[in-house]
């Protein structure tokens, strides 16, 4: 699946819920199924700066595609990073770099987060794209 197709699938899933309480519960469930980062990668190098909670993200390049693992000490934040990893993991770095992230606005996520969590979301996206840039440079 392309990033766009995955994002559309996420938007469809979120549209099935009537209210934000149900969406938060769904995000918590997504966080529980997050591919967890190995303890050795829970370092300052992998921590997302600008997040209210602690969030670690690690990327590996496998057959020209990035795979991400992550963890957070907060359940909602864990769900947020799970959504991003679902959208971007298994994709080519160039596709991640070029990807539009407006699906976040389509599901209404930013407007239902506190300002510090919304800043954290932006920082998570930025870090994922920075990993993609770093690995794309290696591929060239």
Predicted regions located by residue number:
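A generic alpha-helix surface/boundary motif
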Residues: 8, 78-79, 98
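Short small-residue beta-strand/loop micro-motif enriched in glycine and branched aliphatics
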Residues: 65-69, 78
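Alpha-helical support elements that line or immediately flank enzyme active sites
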Residues: 80-91
């Amino acid at each position: 699946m392309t990033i766009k197709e995955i994002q559309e699938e996420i938007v469809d899933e979120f549209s099935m819920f009537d209210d934000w309480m149900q969406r938060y519960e769904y995000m918590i469930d997504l966080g529980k199924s997050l591919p967890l980062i190995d303890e050795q990668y829970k370092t300052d190098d992998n921590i997302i700066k600008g997040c209210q909670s602690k969030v670690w993200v690690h990327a590996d390049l496998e057959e020209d595609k990035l795979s991400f693992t992550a963890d957070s000490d907060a359940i909602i934040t864990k769900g947020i990073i799970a959504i991003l990893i679902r959208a971007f993991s298994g994709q080519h770095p160039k596709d991640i770099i070029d990807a539009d992230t407006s699906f976040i606005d389509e599901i209404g996520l930013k407007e239902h987060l506190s300002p510090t969590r919304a800043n954290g979301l932006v920082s998570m996206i930025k870090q994922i794209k920075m990993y993609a840039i770093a690995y794309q440079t290696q591929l060239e």
